Protein backbone atom coordinates (compact mmCIF):
# COMPACT_ATOMS: atom_id res chain seq x y z
CA UNK A 1 0.00 0.00 0.00
CA UNK A 2 1.70 3.26 -1.07
CA UNK A 3 2.32 6.17 1.28
CA UNK A 4 -0.21 8.45 -0.40
CA UNK A 5 -2.37 11.17 1.10
CA UNK A 6 -5.16 8.61 1.39
CA UNK A 7 -3.27 6.58 4.00
CA UNK A 8 -0.59 8.93 5.34
CA UNK A 9 -2.99 10.87 7.63
CA UNK A 10 -0.80 13.91 6.89
CA UNK A 11 -3.71 16.34 7.30
CA UNK A 12 -3.85 15.51 11.01
CA UNK A 13 -1.63 16.23 13.98
CA UNK A 14 -2.35 12.94 15.78
CA UNK A 15 -2.19 9.74 13.71
CA UNK A 16 -2.55 6.02 14.32
CA UNK A 17 -1.46 2.92 12.46
CA UNK A 18 -0.16 -0.59 13.15
CA UNK A 19 3.35 -2.01 13.12
CA UNK A 20 6.29 -1.33 10.85
CA UNK A 21 4.10 -1.27 7.76
CA UNK A 22 2.01 1.41 9.46
CA UNK A 23 5.09 3.52 10.08
CA UNK A 24 5.84 3.36 6.36
CA UNK A 25 2.27 4.33 5.46
CA UNK A 26 2.10 7.35 7.74
CA UNK A 27 3.57 10.70 6.85
CA UNK A 28 6.79 11.49 8.76
CA UNK A 29 6.08 12.79 12.26
CA UNK A 30 8.05 14.80 14.78
CA UNK A 31 7.22 12.33 17.56
CA UNK A 32 6.51 8.60 17.35
CA UNK A 33 4.88 6.82 20.28
CA UNK A 34 5.41 3.06 20.21
CA UNK A 35 2.76 1.01 22.02
CA UNK A 36 3.06 -2.67 22.90
CA UNK A 37 1.17 -2.96 26.16
CA UNK A 38 2.31 -6.40 27.30
CA UNK A 39 5.68 -6.33 25.54
CA UNK A 40 7.96 -3.38 24.82
CA UNK A 41 5.90 -0.88 26.83
CA UNK A 42 5.93 -3.09 29.93
CA UNK A 43 9.67 -3.83 29.66
CA UNK A 44 10.69 -0.23 29.03
CA UNK A 45 8.58 1.12 31.89
CA UNK A 46 9.88 -1.53 34.27
CA UNK A 47 13.51 -0.71 33.44
CA UNK A 48 13.08 3.06 33.59
CA UNK A 49 11.08 2.99 36.82
CA UNK A 50 14.02 1.19 38.41
CA UNK A 51 16.38 3.89 37.19
CA UNK A 52 17.85 1.69 34.47
CA UNK A 53 17.69 1.50 30.70
CA UNK A 54 16.25 -1.01 28.27
CA UNK A 55 18.52 -2.24 25.50
CA UNK A 56 16.89 -2.60 22.11
CA UNK A 57 16.68 -6.35 21.68
CA UNK A 58 15.98 -7.76 18.22
CA UNK A 59 12.30 -7.74 17.36
CA UNK A 60 9.50 -5.79 15.76
CA UNK A 61 9.49 -3.08 18.43
CA UNK A 62 13.21 -2.46 18.12
CA UNK A 63 13.07 -2.40 14.33
CA UNK A 64 10.18 0.05 14.35
CA UNK A 65 11.84 2.32 16.92
CA UNK A 66 15.09 2.41 14.96
CA UNK A 67 13.28 3.10 11.71
CA UNK A 68 11.33 5.97 13.26
CA UNK A 69 14.46 7.47 14.79
CA UNK A 70 16.28 7.05 11.49
CA UNK A 71 13.58 9.15 9.86
CA UNK A 72 14.25 11.92 12.37
CA UNK A 73 11.47 11.31 14.89
CA UNK A 74 11.71 11.64 18.65
CA UNK A 75 10.72 8.13 19.75
CA UNK A 76 9.03 7.31 23.05
CA UNK A 77 7.22 4.32 24.52
CA UNK A 78 3.68 4.74 25.82
CA UNK A 79 0.53 2.94 26.84
CA UNK A 80 -2.03 2.56 29.57
CA UNK A 81 0.37 2.98 32.49
CA UNK A 82 1.98 6.25 31.35
CA UNK A 83 -0.48 7.82 28.91
CA UNK A 84 -0.82 11.08 30.86
CA UNK A 85 2.96 11.35 31.25
CA UNK A 86 3.48 10.79 27.52
CA UNK A 87 0.92 13.46 26.67
CA UNK A 88 2.62 15.95 29.01
CA UNK A 89 5.99 15.09 27.45
CA UNK A 90 4.60 15.69 23.96
CA UNK A 91 3.14 19.03 25.03
CA UNK A 92 6.51 20.07 26.50
CA UNK A 93 8.25 19.15 23.25
CA UNK A 94 5.68 21.13 21.26
CA UNK A 95 6.17 24.18 23.46
CA UNK A 96 9.94 23.90 23.10
CA UNK A 97 9.62 23.72 19.31
CA UNK A 98 7.28 26.69 19.26
CA UNK A 99 5.03 25.19 16.60
CA UNK A 100 2.49 22.45 16.10
CA UNK A 101 4.10 19.04 16.46
CA UNK A 102 2.91 15.93 14.63
CA UNK A 103 2.53 12.68 16.57
CA UNK A 104 2.26 9.18 15.16
CA UNK A 105 0.97 6.48 17.50
CA UNK A 106 2.22 3.07 16.37
CA UNK A 107 0.49 0.10 17.94
CA UNK A 108 2.71 -2.93 17.43
CA UNK A 109 0.10 -5.64 17.55
CA UNK A 110 1.25 -9.26 17.35
CA UNK A 111 3.41 -10.52 14.48
CA UNK A 112 1.59 -13.18 12.47
CA UNK A 113 4.72 -14.89 11.17
CA UNK A 114 8.37 -14.42 12.15
CA UNK A 115 10.29 -12.41 9.61
CA UNK A 116 7.24 -10.76 8.05
CA UNK A 117 5.45 -7.43 8.49
CA UNK A 118 2.07 -9.14 8.92
CA UNK A 119 0.46 -7.92 12.15
CA UNK A 120 -2.43 -9.41 14.09
CA UNK A 121 -4.83 -7.00 15.77
CA UNK A 122 -4.23 -6.86 19.53
CA UNK A 123 -6.86 -5.27 21.76
CA UNK A 124 -4.26 -4.59 24.48
CA UNK A 125 -2.32 -2.38 22.09
CA UNK A 126 -5.47 -0.68 20.82
CA UNK A 127 -6.35 0.20 24.42
CA UNK A 128 -2.83 1.50 25.06
CA UNK A 129 -2.85 3.59 21.91
CA UNK A 130 -6.32 4.90 22.70
CA UNK A 131 -5.20 5.89 26.19
CA UNK A 132 -2.36 8.00 24.78
CA UNK A 133 -4.61 9.61 22.17
CA UNK A 134 -7.26 10.43 24.79
CA UNK A 135 -4.60 11.91 27.09
CA UNK A 136 -3.29 14.08 24.25
CA UNK A 137 -6.84 15.29 23.65
CA UNK A 138 -7.17 16.20 27.32
CA UNK A 139 -4.25 18.60 26.83
CA UNK A 140 -5.74 20.15 23.70
CA UNK A 141 -3.73 18.11 21.21
CA UNK A 142 -6.85 16.81 19.54
CA UNK A 143 -6.57 17.33 15.78
CA UNK A 144 -6.75 13.57 15.29
CA UNK A 145 -7.22 11.46 12.20
CA UNK A 146 -10.36 9.32 12.07
CA UNK A 147 -8.22 6.29 12.89
CA UNK A 148 -6.79 7.98 15.97
CA UNK A 149 -10.09 9.56 17.00
CA UNK A 150 -11.90 6.22 17.02
CA UNK A 151 -9.20 4.68 19.20
CA UNK A 152 -9.21 7.62 21.60
CA UNK A 153 -12.97 7.80 21.96
CA UNK A 154 -13.18 4.04 22.22
CA UNK A 155 -10.82 4.21 25.16
CA UNK A 156 -12.88 6.97 26.79
CA UNK A 157 -15.97 4.77 26.49
CA UNK A 158 -14.34 1.56 27.73
CA UNK A 159 -11.55 2.85 29.95
CA UNK A 160 -13.35 1.83 33.11
CA UNK A 161 -13.26 -1.78 31.97
CA UNK A 162 -9.55 -1.88 31.08
CA UNK A 163 -8.64 -4.42 33.76
CA UNK A 164 -11.28 -6.87 32.56
CA UNK A 165 -10.61 -6.25 28.87
CA UNK A 166 -6.88 -6.76 29.25
CA UNK A 167 -7.08 -9.91 31.35
CA UNK A 168 -9.76 -11.37 29.05
CA UNK A 169 -7.96 -10.50 25.82
CA UNK A 170 -6.11 -13.11 23.81
CA UNK A 171 -2.71 -11.67 24.67
CA UNK A 172 -3.63 -11.29 28.34
CA UNK A 173 -4.89 -14.85 28.60
CA UNK A 174 -1.81 -16.19 26.83
CA UNK A 175 0.55 -14.34 29.17
CA UNK A 176 -1.44 -15.41 32.23
CA UNK A 177 -1.26 -19.04 31.08
CA UNK A 178 2.53 -18.71 31.10
CA UNK A 179 2.47 -17.49 34.71
CA UNK A 180 2.31 -13.78 33.92
CA UNK A 181 -1.12 -12.85 35.31
CA UNK A 182 0.46 -10.34 37.71
CA UNK A 183 2.23 -8.70 34.77
CA UNK A 184 -1.10 -8.33 32.99
CA UNK A 185 -2.66 -6.72 36.06
CA UNK A 186 0.26 -4.29 36.37
CA UNK A 187 -0.05 -3.37 32.70
CA UNK A 188 -3.75 -2.63 33.22
CA UNK A 189 -3.16 0.09 35.83
CA UNK A 190 -4.01 3.42 34.23
CA UNK A 191 -1.50 6.26 34.64
CA UNK A 192 0.33 4.50 37.45
CA UNK A 193 3.71 5.46 35.94
CA UNK A 194 5.08 8.98 35.55
CA UNK A 195 8.13 7.96 33.52
CA UNK A 196 8.45 8.32 29.74
CA UNK A 197 10.98 5.98 28.10
CA UNK A 198 12.78 7.84 25.29
CA UNK A 199 14.95 6.22 22.65
CA UNK A 200 18.57 7.32 23.08
CA UNK A 201 20.81 5.50 20.64
CA UNK A 202 20.23 1.80 21.25
CA UNK A 203 18.53 2.10 24.63
CA UNK A 204 15.33 3.46 26.11
CA UNK A 205 15.95 5.67 29.12
CA UNK A 206 13.70 7.91 31.20
CA UNK A 207 13.15 11.37 29.74
Task: Place the predicted regions along the sequence by residue.
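Short glycine-rich anion-binding loops that position phosphate/pyrophosphate groups of nucleotides
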Residues: 38, 110-111
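Residues that scaffold, gate, or flank divalent-cation-dependent active/transport sites
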Residues: 12-31, 37-88
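Long, charged alpha-helical interface segments
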Residues: 59-77, 88, 97-101, 117-207
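A short glycine/serine-rich beta->alpha loop
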Residues: 29-31, 114-120
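Short, structured patches in soluble enzyme cores that scaffold and shape functional sites
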Residues: 79, 105-110
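Actinobacteria-biased recognition of intrinsically disordered, low-complexity terminal regions
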Residues: 1-12, 207
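Short hydrophobic beta-strand segments
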Residues: 30-35, 102-107
Amino acid sequence: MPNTAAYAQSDYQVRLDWGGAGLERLAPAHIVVVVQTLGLTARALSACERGGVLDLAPGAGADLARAAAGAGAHVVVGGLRNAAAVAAHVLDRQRARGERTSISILALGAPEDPGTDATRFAVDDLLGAGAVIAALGDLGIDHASPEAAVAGEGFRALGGAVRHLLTASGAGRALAAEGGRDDVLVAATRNAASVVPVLDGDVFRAA
